[in-house]
């Protein structure tokens, strides 16, 4: 609605209410009102890094002394956004998805705790497979782990050959011994789909006693 009004009015005399009350801007506020949470509340709209940004913020808050942090992500399919992504070729060969996942982060292990988040790393620059491999080695080493420690490698394969081939090469070169799976086969492709991957990993670690580390 806001974008249509932006075009119709040639970027002049716009009422910002529709933007202010848009889904992404109100979910965090509505949850806080419903749950009566009067604490730090922030929403990240960083496309594919939105959930990771929220997660890193939550980890930093825990490090600063907070005891509990609610972190999560949500996305929904709208006809307009779906058409635009199709025209740009972003959905070619993939299945569009949507979802919402939330996690309660705690400073200490509690009775309900069933997984530990060891760390999060992000990068947005284009890298070759060897560069990505080196970065993953460094990430694991920073947490006193090696590739052979990983029991389950969860990739973001979505049906696009160009990116799927990168995951396949990493599976063969770094984690040939691990269980391989693609979470987007279940949830589809959307900007915060990685939140589904984290839920999927945490749930599996809870149910499968034989698995210790998932990446």
Where are these regions (language model features)?
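Short, surface-exposed, charged loop/turn segments at secondary-structure junctions
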Residues: 2-6, 81-92, 170-171
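Acyl-CoA/ACP chain-elongation machinery
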Residues: 73-84, 92, 119-129, 155-165, ...
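Conserved active-site "lid/cap" helical segment
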Residues: 1, 56-57, 127-151, 162-166, ...
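Short beta-strand segments
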Residues: 45, 69-75, 215
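Condensing-enzyme catalytic core mediating Claisen C-C bond formation in acyl metabolism
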Residues: 82-152, 177, 215
